[in-house]
């Protein structure tokens, strides 16, 4: 898709050449004299108001929503091509433009799925925080090596659940109150050493450009040129377990290969000037949490702190890397990545994957319902299952039913291992590309 017309969040495809990300609200970079938007209500609680290019109220919610309209001519051309693939009896091509529009998916989702209930959202926060402190109290009380491994798994999962709730605050799906979202988001994310605004802004870039080779932000593919310029040690670390599952803290400080910037520094390429204060606020909160942990180590001892917090923190990082990677990689069929005019918000979003985590689904707030979340991030997590079921008839083969999990999702480790062995880089040329394999890294035949 060449361009998108938005009436809520100003979402646009970023330029093909992206040396310095422009991650602020795209409308702020336009001619201010040409911007005269009034408040609009989309029926899902999201609204904003611009006049002469100046926001009338500050909203810390992650300003990413699905585009409401696309150019009709391009839309019709893509629909016809997709219909030929699906209805013409040919083998399904996941890279073909879909025979439906984003609005078709939206219309299939019940209206109540868009409603945000702050009391219900806060209920999940209270539940998770209570479980976190309860687990820590039980582990500290028994303090034996039968309990500790069980505690580490359970607590790392709960830390990850806290991250997901903070993630919802960043999207604005937690509530319609931006101040409530910001306060709760800072508390939850700072408690697990995540800079709330810094991450929120980069995650916005990810959603705005999902499925784009260069412009996507997290777990995007390496181009062949960048990949071949990596030294052997870096390649091994990136594609050999468990190292990819420990990447998140490094990503916060230095991002992915081929990109520069830090989630902590207000002058990073990730941010635009009007976001500096938010980034500084989050970095201060992160520093305060780190200072609190240092002080706590003098009270209970560094070994006890490592057992109560340090190991669960690392487990949380592994959960985060596992889940976020597998929502965009690891399907048994190779899925496309896009560039240039072949990329569109809809086509990029349809490359995402749902995953089943068994008993963990409810604990981490159904984050596995990822396709609809990526297309419509303003839907609260507690409505995503219903919204997904309603959208499936429209999505057809573009929705890939996740493999049913056992109580614990050990099967996903197989998907992860397979992907790390085969998904190494994409071609430097072409607007629809697929992962290729480096035979020198794995000993496999090049694909």
Swiss-Prot record:
Signal peptide: none annotated. A motif (Histidine box-3) lies at residues 370-374. This is Omega-3 fatty acid desaturase, chloroplastic. The lineage of its organism: Eukaryota, Viridiplantae, Streptophyta, Embryophyta, Tracheophyta. It holds the Pfam family FA_desaturase. It is a peripheral membrane protein. A motif (Histidine box-1) lies at residues 167-171. It comes from Sesamum indicum. The histidine box domains may contain the active site and/or be involved in metal ion binding. Its EC number is 1.14.19.-. It comes from the Eukaryota. A motif (Histidine box-2) lies at residues 203-207.
